[in-house]
Regions:
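Conserved SAM/AdoMet-binding glycine-rich loop
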Residues: 81-86, 95, 198-261
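Proteins enriched for Cys/Gly/acidic motifs involved in redox and nucleic-acid/cofactor modification
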Residues: 2-214, 254
Length: 261
């Protein structure tokens, strides 16, 4: 996608750390802001809004995020109207939101992974108030559809099929910051893919913390990953289908047959 610049519009700058899931969620944050009259910019220096979409899987990602947040202190001092927001996995960790508030008192909005779809409401709340907005829900909610998306990787597109993870691997923090596994309806995923193909996208990557267990939380035996990729593969158009990430314990014979066909 080529984004044309309009000098009359306010500008937003989004900094993303971590996985493909975060990259796609940053596209959703951009979509929300674009729907409110903002346009993306490639530098924080002329931005009216700066959003950090953070990662906590690796300590290095947290250190880089904190370093870059701290570097905005002078910019915020020079521009009191600048709005700085921090979201993503880092903010979802227990006690991290208050720690960020203490370390960086110039942050305006802190929101958790379960509050991304609420970002528009939080942003409007900040525009109408001088108070800091901190919303980090501990419990994941149902899957919400219809969040606007400004895609930036044409002709490639990310499509979420699950959120969260039920595998509590010893080394991994994901279930604690992303919540329990929730699957999108198969019809919603297929319709999104159908529209992307119609729009000319040539590569679609299905996203989830564990795509192989797609549908396990839905009471319908036909809703599973093997059937999903089979149905998407039947769509008209010239495109490549990919997926990530997957856990070997849920890799079964129907899935092998679906991939091989």
């Amino acid at each position: 996608m080529i984004l044309t610049m309009n000098s009359n519009l306010k500008k937003c700058f989004i900094i993303t750390y971590g996985c493909q899931m975060n990259l796609h969620e940053s596209e959703k944050i951009a979509g929300i802001l674009c729907s409110m009259g903002y346009q993306p910019t490639n530098t924080e220096n002329n931005a009216d809004v700066i959003v950090f979409n953070t990662c906590c899987i690796r300590e290095n990602a947290e250190d880089r995020a904190e370093g870059n947040i701290g570097a905005l202190k002078k910019l915020k001092r020079a521009n009191k109207d600048l709005i700085i927001a921090v979201g993503g996995c880092m903010t979802q960790q227990k006690g991290q939101a208050e720690e960020l508030k203490s370390k960086f008192p110039f942050i305006d909005i802190i929101f958790g992974t379960h509050n991304l779809e609420d970002f528009k409401a939080l942003f409007l709340q900040k525009l109408n108030s001088k108070k800091k907005i901190i919303v980090v829900d501990e419990k994941e909610g149902p899957v919400k559809e219809g969040t606007p998306t400004t895609r930036t990787s044409y002709p490639n597109a990310w499509v979420n099929i699950t959120y969260g993870c039920n595998n509590f691997c010893t080394y991994c923090i994901v279930p604690y910051v992303r919540g329990r596994e929730r699957s999108r309806k198969m019809s919603d995923v297929i319709n999104e893919c159908k529209q992307l193909i119609k729009d000319g996208y040539k590569e679609i990557t299905l996203l989830g913390q564990n795509v192989n267990s797609y549908g396990n939380d839905i009471d319908d035996e036909n809703t599973n990953f093997a059937n999903l990729i089979s149905e998407i593969s039947k769509l008209d158009g010239d495109f490549r289908l990919r997926f990530m990430t997957n856990h070997p314990k849920d890799f079964n014979l129907p899935l092998i047959k679906a991939i091989s066909s």
